[in-house]
C-alpha cells in the first residue's frame, strides 16, 4: 500500500487477487485505511477468501444454471477456480501452479473434465461446450462477488481510483469493468504499468523499491 501511495495514487483502492484470496485495501491520504485483523477485514469487505486458483467451485455457489435449469451441484472437491480461469483464458497453464483436485495435469482438457464433475458428470455425458458454460456460470458468480465488495469499500471511503494487481488481474478487469462505464472510476493495472512479473510479486517489488528510495535518501543526506 505504501508503494502504491508513493508511486501511483494517494487516494485509491488497491485490489490484489492472488491464488487463494483477494485483498481490497483502501488508501486514504497516502495511508492504508484497512482494518488490522483478518476477522475485521472479512467483516468490512476488505478480504475475500476467493482467489484465481485454489477456491473450490462449490464454495462460490451450491447451484448454477445448466440447460436453462437451476441445478444443484456437488460439494465435493472436484474443481477449483484455477480450472475456470484456465478454460476461460484468464490464466495460462504455467500460471496454474497449485495442485489440481484430481492430481491430473493442469491443462484445458482435464480442467473441463474436473468442471463437469461438479455436476457429478463427465465429458461422455455432457459436451465440452456445456462444461465451458458451467465455467462461465461460475465465473459470473466470482466476478459479481468481487464487484460487490469493491463497491462497498468505494462507497465507504469515496474512492474512485482502483489499482489492480496479482495473478488474477484479468479477472479483476472483468469484475470491475462495470465501474468504468460511468467514467467515474479509473482502473490502473500494475501489470500494464510495470509488467506481469511485478504484478505477480507486487509486495516483494514494492519492498525493494521502498528500500532503494530510503537508501538513496540517506546517501543524499550524507
Swiss-Prot record:
Gene3D superfamilies: conserved archaeal protein q6m145
The enzyme's E.C. designation: 2.5.1.131
Pathway in which the depicted protein is active: Cofactor biosynthesis; methanofuran biosynthesis
Molecular function as annotated in GO: hydrolase activity; transferase activity
Protein name, entry field: (4-{4-[2-(gamma-L-glutamylamino)ethyl]phenoxymethyl}furan-2-yl)methanamine synthase
Family to which the UniProt record says this protein belongs: Belongs to the MfnF family.
Keyword hit for Nucleotidyltransferase: no
Pfam families documented for this protein: Hydantoinase_A (PF01968)
Catalytic activity: gamma-L-glutamyltyramine + [5-(aminomethyl)furan-3-yl]methyl diphosphate = (4-{4-[2-(gamma-L-glutamylamino)ethyl]phenoxymethyl}furan-2-yl)methanamine + diphosphate
UniProt keywords, alphabetically: Transferase
Function: Catalyzes the condensation between 5-(aminomethyl)-3-furanmethanol diphosphate (F1-PP) and gamma-glutamyltyramine to produce APMF-Glu.
Keyword Transferase: yes
